[in-house]
Amino acid sequence: NYKYLHYFFDHYRNRKLIKKDFPDEIWIENTNHCNAACVMCPRELQSRKKGIMDLDLYKKLIDEISLHKDVVKRLHMHNFGEPLLDKKLPLRIKYAKKKGIKHVYFVTNASLLTEKNSYDLINCGLDEFKISFYGVDKESYNNTMINLDFDKTLSNIINFFAIRKRLKSKQPKIILQLIPNSLTVNKVKEKWLNLFNKYIDHSIGDRFN
């Protein structure tokens, strides 16, 4: 999507580079497997072998990061894969929080946000996650997020909020990301608000936040 890429290019190209002894935001890719084939995603172009990060290697990285926990503002647990395909994700998050990492975060398509995963993510100390939900109805969603199902994912999201409310927890916070397709922004905004407004904590999209 040219408009989407152009927005990020404009956003980052004029930012001043600052040299630091240790980065304040860190990405750890726990897996590069994904169960979706979104039409705009370039992940299939990657030549790297697909897999899940070894737990001992992960702990070694977290141990090193924890030495700079006063500097690190956020740990991103994602990159080209779907983090929830890693069954040890809650364990990894719990370890990072135990080591004093301030803010642990990841991006998911929420198709695997089952009841068990919902409980585990709430109880492991996760601070926040973003849901990529590219569609405002069954047709637009299923045509964009190939291999996933609109009704199932929507049900997962609604059930997650019900579980979080039942546990009387305010964490993790949820951000919903929506990328409009051929629909106009106003129509997308109206449908999107009707669909999610009573559930989400924050949202980002195409010029409406």
Regions found by a protein language model. Give the residues of each.
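Radical SAM enzyme [4Fe-4S]-AdoMet core and its adjacent flexible, acidic
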Residues: 29, 51, 99, 119-209
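Conserved alpha-helical substructure of the radical SAM core
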Residues: 1-128, 143, 151-155
